[in-house]
Regions:
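Non-catalytic DNA-recognition/assembly elements of restriction-modification systems
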Residues: 1-29, 158-204
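Sequence-specific dsDNA recognition surfaces
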Residues: 11-26, 42-71
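Compositionally biased, charged N-terminal/linker segments
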Residues: 30-44
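Short hydrophobic-aromatic micro-motifs
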Residues: 37-40, 69, 74-77
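Short, charged/polar surface micro-motifs in flexible loops or helix N-caps
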Residues: 44-47, 60-61, 74, 80-83, ...
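A short beta-sheet element
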Residues: 71, 77-123
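A short glycine-rich beta-alpha junction/loop motif
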Residues: 99-105, 139-165
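Short, positively charged
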Residues: 113-152
Length: 204
């Protein structure tokens, strides 16, 4: 039988904020600027991110300090298909040496590690149940829009921290296996395509 665990709202275990406003990106500053990478929803390609592609931008030092991301931060899109992605390493290690900033179309979830495991929260937010809850709260017809408040109020079960970590580890392993199988399938497709092209004499 499934176990019963207390439910909490996301805002009880994490700080939830919007991404950087568009008006603050590439804003001139007399105090100099810091080069950063701005993450948009297209970069959120899995629950556990080991590499991040972002757009180049320059931010005043105070703005960069206020908006730059940290290891353990979770990003979700503010529109489109809802999903959640965890920064598993320091941002500079994910981006080739740049600080990272969540773009205007993202929300940032910074989990209090003393209350919950960030990897577990990222997994919970990626489940079909959480996605359905966010879809139900969305505004907009052609494109679903997710508010920061709706994200902050989403509720989910919170088991003991040790179990949170075990569940997150299992989810991480499953994602790694899926990626490995996908890469194998791509390689097999490339080999097959090459072989068939040789049969046709259709070679570069």
């Amino acid at each position: 039988m499934p176990q019963k665990f207390p439910y909490v709202k996301l805002e009880e275990v994490a700080l939830v904020r919007a991404g950087i406003p568009s008006r603050e990106i590439d804003r001139p500053s007399e105090d100099g600027v810091i080069p950063v990478k701005v993450i948009n929803p297209a970069a959120l390609v899995g629950t556990y991110l080991s590499k991040v592609e972002g757009e180049d931008a320059s931010l005043p030092g105070t703005v960069a300090t206020r908006h730059c991301l940290k290891e353990g931060d979770i990003l979700t899109p503010s529109r489109g298909v809802f999903r959640a992605s965890l920064l598993e390493k320091e941002p500079e290690l994910l981006s080739g040496g740049f600080q990272l900033v969540a773009g205007p179309l993202c929300h940032v979830v910074r989990v209090d590690a003393g209350k919950a495991d960030p990897a577990y929260v990222a997994w919970v937010l990626s489940t079909p149940v959480a996605q359905a809850k966010m879809t139900a709260s969305a505004r907009g017809a052609a494109v679903r829009l997710y508010s920061r408040d709706a994200l902050a109020e989403i509720d989910f079960p919170l088991p003991p921290i040790d179990l949170q970590r075990k569940l997150a580890s299992a989810a991480r392993d499953a994602q790694a296996l899926m990626i490995a199988r996908r890469d194998e399938a791509r390689l097999e497709l490339a080999i097959t395509t090459q072989e068939l092209s040789e049969i046709l004499g259709f070679n570069a």
